Amino acid sequence: MSFPYSRISKSENETTTIAEEFSKYLKPGMIVVLNGDLGTGKTFFTKQVLKKFGVTNSNSPTFAIVNPYSGDEVFYHFDFYRINKEAELHDIGIEDYFKDEESIIIVEWGNLFPQVIPHKRIEINISFSNENEREFSFKEYE
């Protein structure tokens, strides 16, 4: 997979395939940011990525802010949707998570607090291309 990269998904099965392809690229120290409207499939995509690494008990961290997972790799899955102030992210030590070279960080709704996201990241924007299709746009920032 090389970036930028775009794919259209017409079903959950196709989204799973896209997530599995993307999973092959991931390694410790990477930060992945998923942006998109409610219902575009950010959490579903993340769950499929985690499954490829042996994590089967994942759920959205909307209320917890961050969920840690251990499988073939260590993951920290963030959801910024319910965060009201940037200070809340600093209170949980967001900078320390981002510096962790031994884990993979996945952030949903990173566009809500772009100032805390490191420049080096992979950003995935998910949008509705029509009622039953999603467009996945991948871009890597160095």
For each feature predicted by the language model, list its residue ranges.
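N-terminal pre-Walker A segment at the start of P-loop NTPase domains
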Residues: 1-21
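Short phosphate-coordinating micro-motif centered on Lys-Gly-acidic
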Residues: 3-5, 85, 95-142
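Phosphate-binding P-loop
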Residues: 23-29
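Short hydrophobic/aromatic beta-strand immediately N-terminal to the Walker A/P-loop
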Residues: 31-33
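P-loop (Walker A) phosphate-binding loop of NTP-binding proteins
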Residues: 35-37
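Conserved lysine of the Walker
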Residues: 42
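Short beta-strand-centered segment that lines the nucleotide-binding/catalytic pocket of NTP-utilizing
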Residues: 55-70
